[in-house]
UniProtKB/Swiss-Prot annotation:
Species in which this protein is naturally found: Schizosaccharomyces pombe (strain 972 / ATCC 24843)
GO BP terms: cell division; chromosome organization; chromosome segregation; DNA damage response; meiotic nuclear division; negative regulation of mitotic sister chromatid separation
Cellular component terms (Gene Ontology): cytoplasm; meiotic spindle; nucleus; separase-securin complex
Entry's free-text remark on domains: The N-terminal destruction boxes (D-box 1 and D-box 2) act as a recognition signal for degradation via the ubiquitin-proteasome pathway.
Gene of this entry: cut2
Sequence repeats: 250-260, 270-280
Protein's recorded name: Securin
Locations listed in the record: Cytoplasm; Nucleus
Motif (D-box 1): 33-36
Length: 301
């Protein structure tokens, strides 16, 4: 009877094995009951000395497979300080003295407490805790514009209007073209210019030192108006109902002319007769004032 070929279960490096049979050609009955990992010679003759391995409930003679040495070069990052391989030479032909010297150099280097310390040039490859410095918080420096210098204090995006002279030109007639220079400041009070409003003269600022043809003409007209008598209506301080008309003469004197008899009602007595002033008396009072109406202007009346 040819031996039956079987395969192991759960192994990566599986290879075919041949189970050992009894003298009568059957498998051992007690092989399935053997515990896992047992090396007992279950139902095997005394002449067999190969250790038995129970895998997946079946008895096999699998021996430990020794893999070939790795050809990958170990880097310093993969070697731990407590690893025994650092003290033993590997199969690459490294001498024991070189390994011991390297282990002494690594053990002598102090541990770094901070990750932001700048390492020495010879420790860049050996220090596994080295990290580059963080990005700078300044956005201009993080963009790489280190050579650009911007002076933001001297820039004035909103120029103020203080202490700046502005030229204002007033144009009404060809004779009144002049410039008024003003300085704006928050502390200066608001001042309104005094303007003379006349029919023939333009709007000009009153200045006693400024002599122009327009101002001379305006002063002449004002002098003529003052020489003419004018009638002004004033309210009396004694009573609000009575009105007194004063006539101004060329000499500057004013003569009151009462007109209360025209504005007030006649008084009625208990008998029903009304008391009226005689007309001759009022006419006599008007004629005694001796007013020269020839010099009065009809437009002012």
């Amino acid at each position: 009877m040819l031996p039956r070929t079987m395969f192991s279960y759960g192994k990566e490096n599986a290879f075919p094995v041949t189970p050992i049979s009894n003298r009568n050609g059957t498998k051992g009955a007690g092989s399935k009951r053997a515990p896992l990992g047992s090396t007992k010679q279950s139902n095997a003759p005394s002449s067999v000395t190969v250790p038995r391995t129970v895998l997946g409930g079946k008895s096999t003679n699998i021996s430990k497979f020794i893999s070939a040495p790795s050809t990958k070069k170990m880097s310093p990052m993969d070697i731990s300080m407590d690893s025994p391989t650092i003290l033993e030479p590997n199969s690459q032909g490294i001498s024991r003295s070189a390994v011991q010297e390297r282990s002494k150099r690594l053990s002598a280097s102090p541990r770094r407490s901070s990750l932001t310390d700048t390492p020495l040039p010879n420790e860049l490859e050996e220090d596994i805790e080295y990290m580059p410095p963080p990005v700078h918080l300044d956005p201009i420096q993080s963009l790489g514009f280190d050579d650009v210098a911007i002076d933001c204090e001297t820039l004035d995006p909103w120029p103020s209007m203080q202490n700046k002279a502005t030229s204002v030109t007033i144009r009404n007639t060809p004779a009144s073209d002049f410039h008024v220079y003003k300085e704006f400041s928050d502390d200066d009070p608001i001042q309104f210019p005094l303007l003379s409003v006349d029919g023939d003269s333009p709007l000009t600022e009153k200045d006693t030192n400024l002599t122009t043809p327009a101002t001379l003409k305006a002063s002449d007209q004002q002098r003529k108006v003052l020489e003419k008598p004018s009638v002004s209506k004033q309210s009396s301080s004694r009573t609000r109902l009575s009105t007194v008309y004063r006539t101004k003469l060329a000499s500057g004197k004013s003569i009151p002319r009462p007109l209360s008899h025209k504005l007030t009602r006649p008084r009625v007595t208990a008998s029903g007769n009304s008391r009226r002033r005689p007309l001759s008396r009022s006419i006599h009072s008007l004629s005694s004032s001796r007013i020269d109406f020839s010099s009065l202007d009809t437009g002012l009346l």
